[in-house]
């Protein structure tokens, strides 16, 4: 819940000097990316911008405090300020900020700019007190903001120092409007106007000019002089002389003498107590100060000119001028030290009553009240956890004594989930074990079950499925039906364990159950996770179309709940890329893989390993070995600089071994084979993939017997576990083994099985990747004309893809080849004396590649009758009577030229 006063522009006060000369300069602010107002405290930055903002509608205002260094809090308020300016135009960003569903501030801002692209009016965003930001991540994000913000948006930043926002670059490009302390300083005329408004007896222009010069036009000094002159008999000039040369860091003595010592004791205590509040309203003031009518008291303080300012148009929220507020807080620690804990407790209670637990925690921490802090956490911690207030929770839990956590195991569980969310798996188990050792009877009942659910999640994340299964089952046995979150966690873990064990049907049912529970209780990240798992299972079972439809449901969930920036989004677009690759939709597969990299742009480069492997796979399927090599260099660098799950390593190894196969790099394959992991089992698609990598390397090295043993065992496991996609892949690799070993009938047998199974999986690129050896076999099958209709159609499609991407279309019959052929000593005399035209050579190449007459006409973009003429002519020149004879003749020519066909 956001504090309204932080998003309210300060109300323009009566008796303030209208800074006409500065307002004139600000009138052109819409021509700049950034309007920067910088000066020490008390020069009137906020007052000036509130005057400028008066009457503007398309403006958002965000007043910072120290707590805004937390990235999530900064994002929530900044987006809320934009929503304020645009009347709710950026709904997607607002939801993402509220639910913390973004990868980083920069990615959230990128989405913001997409939404703002449809906002065409001038737009202003004011950020006040930016000097309070010390978080370098926020600085970097705001530099990104300024670089990419729409042309119609102007950012207005108020700061006591020069912020780290790339100011020099903006200045060079004339995109910066600057107002500094010299310009903010009051002129003689403005000082005269100021005193005329504040003092009952006007002073001479010469006198006010001297006073203005004495304090160098510092607005706060002028205000203090006017206050002092009203409260006692000191002349304004005497006060000015005392303030001359003084600056904000040396005001304490003056403020004590001239302000605090000149108010009654009740007002003094009111000022000191209320100053602990960063913002205040009637209820807060009444509770903290003990005075009955807080609103009336605030208005009275405002009338006295005691540096209090309204924060909203309703007049409900107030705050002290930062300079005066800091002074009062320091004095409060001196003068009311004994009462201060109780004052903070009162503030915490009032904030809680108004529904702001994070503000209440701030005061409970300041009070050092562990019991109050414990009670707030017991009631609100999980809500704060779900809103990613992780830093605040961690600070709060550290402030509680261990005994307090033991008395409230829910807080131990919370601390453990915090560790889990930060991938500190070892610390989770250590914490829970310590708690179980010291808490009586914890090993029974609901809390123990919740511990086990979390432990199960840690175990599966840490690659220990057996332990995860044991713990998840224990949790589900002990958890009451109403403990939905832990039940969702345990059910999801159990489904993932069964997936790892190859029990796909049972795993699918549990993941569907997880999805149903997660949707029912709005636990959207587990709903998304379960859909991704369902898609992977369906893919493994060979039901790629159903996997596609499940992915569509996941994309819809992401759009509805604005989950685009969760890391899981990358998982989804990656498995979509795998599916598109299987169907030979390579451009779309590449685009999906690149979008996955974009989702992870704010994370460590190692996280991009799987998407990078997918990009390499696309290059290999296209036969683009140069691009694949360039990408492989990066992939191998990432592999050497990170620790990865075995599934990730298997996928990375897959493209490496494929590349070595396509380039004939036996040395690299042999070296890899000596060092790579040899899994104990092959009962899921992760392990099947690694063993397939091993078999492919063995085939490249001519170790056919070893590879056959591996592949036959893989097929046995795949058939028993119904891993149909893996079976399809295994059959294709077995086909290559038989083909290279000269076992042509076995090769044809398993190729027919693979084509038949592909009617279910839809595989195309898995055939294409095997290149010319696959093309030769498919040509023979097509020419035999014995394939069933579906397999015939698929074989032709695969052949077209191979010809397109692996350059077998004209590669053997281009002009250079024909010239060399005609000069070959063994070339048939018929070809030498009656040579084919270049077009006829192209047609012969396409006939050899398995193209029909219609397909050749389409490829060469000529009429079918023209193709028939070319074919008739080349048959006559070659001395052949039919298509099969032409193919055989072309094959002889290729062998003569040294091509292994």
Curated annotation (Swiss-Prot):
So where does ATP get bound? 39-46
Q: Where are the transmembrane segments?
A: none
A GO BP annotation: positive regulation of DNA-templated transcription
List, alphabetically, the PROSITE patterns matched.
HTH_LUXR_1, HTH_LUXR_2
DNA-binding residue intervals: 853-872
User: Does this UniProt record's set of keywords contain Metal-binding?
Assistant: no
Matching entries from Pfam families are given as: GerE, TPR_MalT
Which InterPro entries has this protein been placed in?
Answer: P-loop_NTPase (IPR027417), Sig_transdc_resp-reg_C-effctor (IPR016032), TPR-like_helical_dom_sf (IPR011990), TPR_MalT (IPR041617), Tscrpt_reg_HTH_MalT (IPR023768), Tscrpt_reg_LuxR_C (IPR000792), WH-like_DNA-bd_sf (IPR036388)
Q: Which CDD domains match?
A: LuxR_C_like
GO molecular function annotations of the record: ATP binding; DNA binding; DNA-binding transcription factor activity
Q: How is its activity regulated?
A: Activated by ATP and maltotriose, which are both required for DNA binding.
User: Looking at the record's lineage, which domain of life comes first?
Assistant: Bacteria
Q: Does the keyword Transcription regulation apply?
A: yes
Alphabetically list the UniProt keywords: Activator, ATP-binding, Carbohydrate metabolism, DNA-binding, Nucleotide-binding, Transcription, Transcription regulation
Q: Where is the signal peptide?
A: none
User: Domain HTH luxR-type spans what residues?
Assistant: 829-894
What HAMAP family does the entry give?
HTH_type_MalT
NCBIfam families membership = PRK04841.1
What does the record note on quaternary structure? Monomer in solution. Oligomerizes to an active state in the presence of the positive effectors ATP and maltotriose.
Its biological purpose is as follows: Positively regulates the transcription of the maltose regulon whose gene products are responsible for uptake and catabolism of malto-oligosaccharides. Specifically binds to the promoter region of its target genes, recognizing a short DNA motif called the MalT box.
Please give the family membership noted in the entry: Belongs to the MalT family.
Q: What is the protein name given in its UniProt record?
A: HTH-type transcriptional regulator MalT
Q: Which organism's genome codes for this protein? A: Escherichia coli O6:H1 (strain CFT073 / ATCC 700928 / UPEC)
């Amino acid at each position: 819940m956001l504090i309204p006063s932080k998003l309210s522009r300060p109300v323009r006060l009566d008796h303030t000097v209208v800074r006409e000369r500065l307002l004139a300069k600000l009138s052109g602010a819409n021509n700049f990316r950034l309007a920067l107002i910088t000066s020490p405290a008390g020069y009137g930055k906020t007052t000036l911008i509130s005057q400028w903002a008066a009457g503007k509608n398309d403006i958002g205002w965000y007043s910072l405090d120290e707590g805004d260094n937390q990235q999530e809090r900064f994002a929530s308020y900044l987006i809320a300020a934009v929503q304020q300016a645009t009347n709710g135009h950026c709904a997607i960003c607002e939801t993402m900020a509220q639910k913390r569903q973004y990868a980083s501030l920069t990615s959230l801002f990128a989405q913001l700019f997409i939404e703002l692209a449809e906002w065409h009016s001038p737009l202003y965003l004011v950020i006040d007190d930016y000097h309070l930001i010390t978080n370098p991540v926020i600085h970097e994000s705001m530099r990104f903001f300024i670089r990419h913000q729409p042309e119609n948006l102007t950012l207005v930043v108020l700061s006591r120092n020069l912020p780290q926002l790339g100011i020099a670059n903006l200045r060079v490009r004339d995109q910066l409007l600057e107002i500094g302390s010299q310009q903010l300083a009051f002129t003689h005329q403005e000082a005269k106007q100021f005193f005329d408004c504040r003092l009952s007896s006007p002073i001479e222009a010469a006198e006010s000019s001297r006073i203005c010069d004495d304090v160098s036009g510092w607005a706060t000094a002028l205000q203090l002089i006017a206050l002092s002159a009203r409260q006692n008999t000191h002349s304004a000039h005497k006060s000015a002389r005392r303030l001359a040369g003084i600056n904000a860091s040396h005001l304490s003595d003056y403020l004590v003498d001239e302000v605090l010592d000149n108010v009654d004791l009740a007002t003094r205590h009111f000022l000191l107590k209320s100053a602990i509040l960063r913002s205040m309203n009637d209820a807060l003031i009444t509770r903290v100060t003990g005075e009955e009518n807080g609103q009336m008291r605030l208005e009275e303080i405002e009338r006295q000119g005691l540096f209090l300012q309204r924060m909203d148009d309703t007049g409900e929220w107030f705050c002290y001028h930062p300079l005066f507020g800091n002074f009062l807080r320091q004095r409060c620690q001196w003068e009311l030290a004994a009462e201060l804990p109780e004052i903070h407790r009162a503030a915490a209670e009032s904030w809680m009553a108004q529904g702001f637990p994070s503000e209440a925690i701030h005061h409970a921490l300041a009070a050092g009240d562990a019991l109050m802090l414990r009670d707030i956490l017991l009631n609100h911690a999980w809500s704060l956890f779900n809103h990613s207030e992780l830093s605040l929770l961690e600070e709060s839990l550290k402030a509680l004594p261990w005994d307090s956590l033991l008395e409230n195991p829910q807080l131990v569980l919370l601390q453990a989930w915090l560790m889990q969310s930060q991938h500190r798996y070892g610390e989770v188990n250590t914490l829970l074990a310590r708690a179980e050792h010291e808490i009586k009877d914890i090993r029974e009942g609901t809390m123990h079950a919740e511990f086990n659910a979390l432990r199960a999640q840690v175990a599966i994340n840490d690659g220990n499925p057996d332990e995860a299964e044991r713990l998840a089952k224990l949790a589900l046995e002990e958890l009451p039906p109403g403990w939905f979150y832990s039940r969702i966690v345990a059910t999801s873990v159990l489904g993932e364990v069964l997936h790892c064990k190859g029990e796909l049907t049972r795993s699918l049912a549990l993941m569907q159950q997880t999805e149903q529970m997660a949707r029912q209780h709005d636990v959207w990240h587990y709903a998304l996770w379960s859909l991704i798992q369902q898609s992977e299972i369906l893919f493994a079972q060979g039901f790629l179309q159903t996997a596609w439809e499940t992915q569509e449901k996941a994309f819809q969930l992401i759009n509805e709940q604005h989950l685009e920036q969760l890391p899981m989004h990358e998982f989804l677009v990656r498995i979509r890329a795998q599916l598109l690759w299987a169907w030979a939709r390579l451009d779309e597969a590449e685009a999906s893989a690149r979008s996955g990299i974009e989702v992870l742009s704010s994370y460590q480069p190692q996280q991009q390993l799987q998407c990078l492997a997918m990009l390499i796979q696309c290059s290999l399927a296209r036969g683009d070995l140069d691009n694949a090599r360039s990408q492989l260099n990066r992939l191998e660098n990432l592999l050497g600089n990170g620790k990865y799950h075995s599934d990730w390593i298997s996928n990375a190894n897959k493209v490496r071994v494929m590349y070595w196969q396509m380039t004939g790099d036996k040395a690299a394959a042999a070296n890899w084979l000596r060092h790579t992991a040899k899994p104990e089992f092959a009962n899921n698609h992760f392990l099947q993939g690694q063993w397939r990598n091993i078999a492919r390397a063995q085939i490249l090295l001519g170790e056919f017997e070893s590879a056959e043993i591996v592949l036959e065992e893989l097929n046995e496991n795949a058939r028993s576990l119904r891993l149909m996609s893996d079976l399809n892949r295994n059959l294709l690799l077995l086909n290559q083994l038989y083909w290279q070993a000269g076992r042509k009938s076995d090769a044809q047998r398993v190729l027919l099985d693979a084509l038949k199974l592909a009617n279910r999986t839809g595989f195309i690129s898995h055939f294409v990747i095997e290149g010319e050896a696959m093309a030769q076999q498919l040509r023979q099958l097509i020419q035999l004309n014995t394939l069933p209709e579906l397999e015939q159609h698929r074989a032709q499609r695969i052949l077209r893809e191979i010809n397109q991407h692996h350059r077998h279309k004209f590669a053997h019959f281009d002009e250079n080849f024909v010239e060399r052929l005609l000069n070959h000593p063994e070339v048939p005399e018929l070809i030498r004396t009656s040579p084919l035209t270049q077009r006829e050579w192209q047609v012969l190449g396409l006939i050899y590649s398995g193209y029909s007459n219609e397909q050749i006409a389409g490829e060469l973009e000529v009429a079918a009758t023209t193709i028939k003429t070319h074919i008739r002519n080349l048959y006559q020149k070659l001395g052949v009577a039919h298509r099969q004879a032409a193919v055989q003749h072309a094959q002889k020519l290729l062998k003569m030229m040294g091509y292994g066909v």
